[in-house]
Amino acid sequence: MAISKEKKNEIIKQFATHEGDTGSTQVQVAVLTADINELNEHLREHKHDYHSQRGLMKKIGHRRNLLAYLRRTDLPAYRELIKALGLRR
């Protein structure tokens, strides 16, 4: 259910703001989005996996808070990230 290290490293390289960047808001949101998409696929097959549903809700809430922070602090980066990830905002 979790994303692989290789996929996570690809996402980090794509959204990093500088070399060695693993913790910027953009990277965190991108990794959470990939995790959320993986969990959605899992839950389509396993509808009654309530523990995973709870984890999905927690990840969505975390992403929502990070996006609100990014929107407050750096609006152009927020808009660029939303467009790159294909989120509906």
Swiss-Prot record:
GO biological process, alphabetically ordered: translation
InterPro entries noted in UniProt: Ribosomal_uS15, Ribosomal_uS15_bac-type, uS15_NS1_RNA-bd_sf
Highest taxon in the source lineage: Bacteria
GO cellular component: cytosolic small ribosomal subunit
GO MF annotation terms: rRNA binding; structural constituent of ribosome
rRNA-binding is among the record's keywords: yes
Pfam families the record matches: Ribosomal_S15 (PF00312)
Keyword annotations: Ribonucleoprotein, Ribosomal protein, RNA-binding, rRNA-binding
Subunit and interaction comment: Part of the 30S ribosomal subunit. Forms a bridge to the 50S subunit in the 70S ribosome, contacting the 23S rRNA.
Family: Belongs to the universal ribosomal protein uS15 family.
Protein name: Small ribosomal subunit protein uS15
Organism: Limosilactobacillus fermentum (strain NBRC 3956 / LMG 18251) (Lactobacillus fermentum)
